[in-house]
């Protein structure tokens, strides 16, 4: 049993930390390490210790090179590396791995630099240094090296070819443990070879630059040395196998600190996953060790006291890294962990986490054992048993029978031990010879393949027959003779075949230069050129000897030099063309031109020449061959010129067609943009007409209520007056006055004012005057009421006529929209046909074109086409959202223009408005849940019921105080008692039209867009109309109302003029369309809120009861998102939902606050008391400016009910927005946005108040707030 050794090492500040003016927070003394808390952390944790102390096996202070306690690479190796080498020679497995955040110095500690090597090179160097000493004493060694990386949880062999990807699979053997399938093992015999393996693997390892480290390791690397040693000790064989795992881990990282995006972010996620799994394994092993050192594989283990204790699950297989290091963590290995630390205060949390993991790792207990060969172990056991039998035989000399049995057993064991020893010796000798042969030949294993690394120049046979083997001929220093077996002098390379002479040629190797010397009359071809004099050959040359023996010449030294010189080029084009031409000439070897062709086995008469070659001294033949070669070269040059010309022609044609396609696509896109902009303008105009129509309907509703009130008042006056007349006449009749005058009132005679005036003439002067004044006064009041009723009826008729005109205009706009959609559909069909034609053209050009640039241009065209299709799809997409309420503005609701002006209102008025908004929020929640079932199939006008005739020009009248038209014929409807039916018809038309318009409004989402110049003017028009409506209800005087109407008409004229100018400017169309969409979205919510309030005040008692029951019925806990009150703000602040927390008396609601900031998003949960503390704190800090902001009051009863929570959610959201607006204008505030201010960021919010600081466990709705 052996505990895991832990060492910590502190690196110096890097350039990033120096630029940040980081402070030193690390201290070391002997084995004790102290981590100081940063200043802010110390202030926050006042009353606690301002440091953390840890004790490890080794502590290395490498912060300052001038410090006398500075720990060098040599010191780290002397403490840790020597132990690893000792373990290897003792037969134990060993593992060293570095752990820490990114940029903390892990790779420097493990690998080092060429001038200052780290642990891995030093361990390898010491391993082979001791190996050389041991070989002198007769010890045999066998060493293999492998190097792998774990990148994105996939394994790659770093010593294999570069084309090998990250596709190796991890397996687990029953007894040998985890291993990587097809991982290449490379036999190494000295330090230079293993250093070359390390350098080759590091060159292929994945690294990248981040904000925290310029050369950040993006993968975990494991360098494994398999070390086998065998020796005879005391006439006893000994063989041990040790595995040394040297691990360089990638560092843990935070995305906001490293600035990782895209692929770097994905790599960091996989790195953190494997490191988290490593930490989980360390924690589980430490906890298991602390619980009794149980390592049984069963679920329950028995303790010494007899009680059963559960064994923890160790998640080795949750990550590739921990799976491969299974034996190193709690298994058969002696392990050393190096914790790399950053001394800067900016990395305090990561450093503390690393120290805690290292402190836990101290408790891990490994179970290392000597890895002895099974045969050697059996031999040793037999030797022990033989010694035991000899001792038994020596002590049993008096008994004959037992001695014979023991003696027989002894002889049997000795014979078995001798056979095993001989087999092991023979096996080891064979293995050593194989290693020597592999080293001499340069053979090494790479996965399932074998690689031949020969250092000497050599020839490789290229056969046309069915031979499956590879023939390699090494060239010796000096002369290498090549010929046939018939030669008088033994040839170094003996060949057979047509054209091979007894002494064919010689190859001279001197000083790395190889020269081919052909013998007279011998056919020697180099790269398809016949040579008859010595020629120097180079790497890759193709050599033909005779007519059938083809070889490729390889010179490793020259190849290495070429790779170094041509490192920037992946392919030597000149060499490729040479080899290609050689292959074309050599292909003629397989073409037999036997004229009769009678027998397939007949030797061909011609191979390379039209006829069998004569003597090379024949000048006519040489001239003929030279002419043929010149002709072929000229033909090749002409073909090459024609190929280049055709290539240029195709390239020019493709470029012209591409430009034409781009131009046509641009024209098509411009046309579609114009159609879309025109459609957006028509939709905006339609929405404005809908808004005006709804305003007129609301005004009609108000006028109807006023007419009803006046009618009721008139009836009351008439009834009182009739009662007064009857009472007076009854008194006169009772007094006998009527009898004196000779007047007699019969029972059926109506008692009117004329009768009373006749009677009053006979009375005294005072009584007559009193009765006349009373009659005149009552008649005057009745006349005024009749005039008011007539005036309201004229207003009602004018509004009805205006609504009818708006409906006609809307029908025209709808028809124009349909025409625009048809035009756009035709354009899309044309564009689809154009794209199909373009694709066909690409296919044709792709078959003819031979250059890479043409493919690149076509890929660009395809990408542009895809972009165009995406844009088109965006413009034609529609939503199925349907809303019920019609857009209306009332005095109980604020418009977007009035948000900033509401800061000084008193709390009572704000509470009254928010009480009204409770029902509107419920209405918006119901609308959001799904389409309304009460929406009609079309728009139903008032005239549709037959109760309101159309208005004629002769019966219209215009009021100067309201500017609306009334139909006098509607008075008959009111007098006949059909006022309620008239209201119902108006309400039905309102709901149906609202539902239709909501389909258009629902197309656009609530996304912040830049505002065009029409935005502020449109909002002014809306505000002016709302002001006029408010004044109509408050009975403002006529002069002021005329001024408001004149202002509204002026704004409308300016809006129409600006809209016409905007249509002429193509550059502003897109921004205007976006603004219209955003404005409609905002107006839709505002009108929806007000309309629900207005309809609730007009409904009958039955409908009021139903709406009240719906508002206060049990509903979802999550409320609807609130309206955007500040569309022009940069920071979007919402309280979209609330959740219930606690139980019993501790039950409360917490509100989710979402703030979108320039440097990220902030989501926090806060209860009402925290909001109140924030308000009181801001009032205390900034005085009257904050006191003027309305804040929701405390509720004494039902404070934890859902309606109260819904009501407060809206008020708290408004309060936070107004608070940010006010505080951003105060120079002393941390979120001041003026000169010198930091503005609204996460840091400034935390500095403003602890309300915006997230807690340690506050990660979502399930955290604490």
From Swiss-Prot:
Cellular component terms per the entry's GO annotation: cytoplasm; early endosome; kinesin complex; microtubule
Pfam families, per database record: FHA, Kinesin, PX
Gene Ontology terms: biological process: asymmetric protein localization involved in cell fate determination; autophagy; early endosome to late endosome transport; plus-end-directed endosome transport along mitotic spindle midzone microtubule; transcytosis; vesicle transport along microtubule
Organism name: Drosophila melanogaster
Keyword Coiled coil appears in the UniProt entry: yes
Name of the coding gene: Klp98A
UniProt cross-references to PROSITE patterns, sorted A to Z: KINESIN_MOTOR_1, KINESIN_MOTOR_2, PX
Protein name: Kinesin-like protein Klp98A
Residue stretches making up the PX domain: 1129-1259
